[in-house]
A protein has these predicted regions:
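Active-site beta-loop-alpha junctions of metal-dependent nucleic acid enzymes
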Residues: 14-35
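Short hydrophobic/aromatic-enriched beta-strand-loop microsegments
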Residues: 57-67
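RNase H-like two-metal-ion nuclease catalytic core shared by retroviral integrases
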Residues: 65-85
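C-terminal domain-tail junction helix/linker
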Residues: 89-144
Length: 144
C-alpha cells in the first residue's frame, strides 16, 4: 500500500502486509493522517478503499474508471512500474522484515535522491521544499 502526493510525487507512506483488504487501507490512511488532510484521494476501483476513505470526512474519493478519465491514477501506476522493475532484480525477499527494509530504502532513494524529469530533475523531497546541503545528502545516504 502506498500514498503518493500528486503535486510533488513524494511517497508519504507505505504499508506492507500479507493481505490487501480494507483493514490495510485503514492502516496506511491512519499512518499519514498527521501529515494533513487531502482535498481528494484518487484510487482505482478496488473495493477495499471505499470504507477507509469514507472515514476521512470532507475528503473526496475519486475512483478512476478508465485510462480515458480526466483524472487518472497514472502517477501511482508509474511508481509501481519503477518499483517492480527494481524489485525484479532482487529475486524476491528473504523475509518480511527484509522486504520492509528494502522497500524503505527504495522509497528513500525515490523521495530524496532520484531526479524526476517531470519535476525539473528534482527529487520529490526538494520539489516539496526540503533544502539539504550536499554534505547532508551524503550523510543521509550513508544512514540509509
Amino acid at each position: 500500500w502506498l500514498i503518493l502526493d500528486s503535486e510533488t510525487r513524494f511517497v508519504l507512506g507505505f504499508h506492507l502486509d500479507r493481505h490487501r483488504d480494507s483493514p490495510q487501507a485503514f492502516t496506511i490512511l491512519e499512518a499519514v493522517k498527521p501529515l494533513g488532510s487531502p482535498g481528494a484521494i484518487v484510487s482505482d476501483r478496488y473495493f477495499a478503499y471505499r470504507m477507509p476513505v469514507k472515514t476521512l470526512h470532507g475528503v473526496q474519493h475519486i475512483r478512476v474508471e478508465s485510462f480515458h478519465d480526466d483524472i487518472t491514477n497514472n502517477l501511482i501506476e508509474c511508481f509501481n512500474k519503477q518499483f517492480k522493475a527494481w524489485y525484479k532484480t532482487k529475486q524476491g525477499f528473504s523475509s518480511f522484515a527484509s522486504a520492509n527494509n528494502l522497500i524503505s530504502m527504495f522509497i528513500f532513494f525515490y523521495n530524496f535522491v532520484r531526479p524526476h524529469s517531470a519535476l525539473n530533475t528534482l527529487p520529490p523531497a526538494q520539489c516539496a521544499g526540503l533544502k539539504l546541503s550536499k554534505k547532508r545528502k551524503r550523510e543521509l545516504l550513508l544512514v540509509a
